[in-house]
């Protein structure tokens, strides 16, 4: 496992390259995108690596197979949920081999590795299922109706709402759920702002009361 890059770290080193291979894809052109971070990691560690988001890394660890990547978490790396493919501009790059094989959310990936099951005394029949982003999970767990929306305070502040069709606008991402779409946008500000108003001890106590 190599060095990770924080979610809120801007990576401007490959700005010109990114703009040339992501024409019209504003969500990929920000210095905070997964693509910007991926290219920075490739510059540092070379192309004989695999690029995985946190959830894909953990799932792969349980399977002892890091082949796969879940569709929602890989949008900011360039995965097109509508066309279900990576951008054509990626095809001739030397780093395409670093990308995961994308699988839809909710699909069974396989059973837990036998050695890990024995090590942690887990049922060897446990199946690993591809997940989704944290804010999508919060939206689904809330059980909201089609006319309702949700604000999620996490690393970022995210606003989500169900829509019949994907919304292709700057700053908006759309995630497929069955025949509908969870559409929303996120800021680069999040729960870190709480540290300006509460001490670590107060945050710990307030969190305990949730």
Residue positions per predicted region:
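A charged helix-plus-loop insertion that forms the helical arch/lid used to bind
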Residues: 2-12, 74-78
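Short acidic/polar alpha-helix capping motifs at helix-coil junctions
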Residues: 53, 103-104
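Internal glycine-rich flexible loops
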Residues: 96
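Glycine-rich phosphate-binding loops at beta-strand->alpha-helix junctions
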Residues: 104-112
């Amino acid at each position: 496992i190599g060095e990770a890059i924080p979610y809120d770290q801007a990576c401007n080193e490959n700005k010109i390259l990114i703009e040339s291979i992501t024409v019209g894809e504003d969500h990929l052109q920000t210095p905070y995108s997964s693509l910007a971070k991926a290219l920075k990691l490739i510059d540092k560690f070379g192309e004989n690596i695999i690029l995985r988001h946190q959830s894909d890394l953990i799932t792969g660890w349980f399977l002892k197979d890091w082949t796969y990547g879940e569709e929602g978490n890989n949008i900011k790396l360039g995965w097109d949920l509508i066309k279900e493919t990576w951008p054509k501009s990626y095809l001739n790059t030397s780093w395409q081999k670093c990308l995961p094989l994308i699988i839809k959310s909710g699909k069974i990936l396989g059973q837990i590795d036998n050695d890990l099951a024995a090590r942690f005394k887990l049922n060897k029949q446990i199946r690993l299922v591809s997940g989704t982003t944290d804010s999508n999970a919060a939206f689904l767990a809330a059980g909201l109706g089609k006319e309702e929306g949700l604000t999620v305070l996490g690393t970022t502040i995210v606003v989500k709402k169900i829509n019949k069709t994907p919304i292709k606008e700057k700053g908006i991402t759309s995630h497929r759920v069955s025949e509908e779409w969870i559409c929303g946008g996120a800021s680069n500000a999040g729960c870190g702002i709480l540290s300006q108003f509460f001490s670590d001890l107060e945050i710990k106590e307030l969190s305990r009361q949730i």
